[in-house]
Amino acid sequence: MADTWTQWLAEPAPSPTQAYTRCTNLATPAACNWLVPVTSGQAPHTLCQACRLNRTIPDLNDPVHPDNGVLWGRIELAKRRLFSSLLALGLPVASLTEDPVHGISFDLLRSPDAGPPVMTGHKAGLITLNLLEADDAVREALRSALREPYRTLLGHFRHEIGHYYWDRLVSGTVWMQGFHQLFGDETQDYAACLQKNYLQDPPAQWWLHYVSAYASTHPWEDWAECWAHYLHMRDTIDTAVSLGLATDSVHLEFIAFTLDALYQPDHPEAQTFLDFLNDWTRLTTLLNEMSRSMGQPDFYPFVLPHEVVAKLHFIHLLVTSGSWLQQGDAPMTEQVELQTQSQNQSQNQSQSQL
């Protein structure tokens, strides 16, 4: 085996042994702990699959902002968590270099001290994140000013990647009919809807139709919010199962969802998703009580109305369909077994253990 700091060999297996090297961002403030496959006869990547997606990172030598490295490290930690989930779900993930048409890239930018703020958002595969979102005080002030119950780096990433996957997996496909049925007409003026959101209160009783007030802004935002919550659910349930956390032995008062709340209640796998959904409800009820016992905000400060449940089921059907494979795109899975988080538990396991 080569230098143990830089290269490893996979455990012996019938097939040829795969060699790996550390991501070079381990030695930077990103502190990346992912590995990179080494292929004989090919120039090796120096960055892992998550770090290769960065187009722009903060200036780590900026004397005016010596905290750039610390803030960047927090952002990269959240980004790795995002991509460990996406890879475990088998979703297509590639950089713009690897896939100039459908690839993903990130600009992690700090707002200039005397200029307009960097706006977090997505456009054609490019996700921009304001570096100051990694400053807890700044982010909490924004959360309070915008009257949001929840604002995290991971939440930002899951929301913005939702916009990417709408372009990538929904737009122009057979899924558009279901999208229009559940989320509405995305052709309405997006900029005008955003302006209206910041000038006016959300619709009356928005909580009966949306997972958040911001989701009521425009069908694209409704989609991205629901996508983020679907990833919250999948990752949290997976973590709970991986750690052996069970709720079936605890009496928890909650009203279970029934099949009629789903997008396709007659789907062959409808009961599987329903069990997953009710497992989520039990788990968040438990975790909210745990948070309150420490004087902390609720772990999951949201309520899922039936209309949102139908949207989540729609997203689940899309994610589990593999329909994008028909377009000739294989999901990028090279890093799945290298993630430090246990992401390989199946949904059926979650039903039997929670």
Residue ranges and their predicted role:
Residues 1-65:
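Cys/His-rich short segments
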Residues 20, 24, 66-136:
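Auxiliary, metal-adjacent structural segments of Zn-dependent hydrolase domains
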Residues 129-140, 192-206, 261:
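Active-site-adjacent bridging/hinge elements
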Residues 137-157:
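Short pre-active-site segment immediately N-terminal to the catalytic Zn-binding motif
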Residues 151-171, 224:
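Active-site recognition of the HExxH zinc-binding catalytic motif
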Residues 167-221, 227-236:
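Post-HExxH zinc-binding segment in Zn-dependent metallohydrolases
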Residues 216-337, 354:
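Pan-zinc metallopeptidase signature
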Residues 335-353:
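Compositionally biased, intrinsically disordered low-complexity segments enriched
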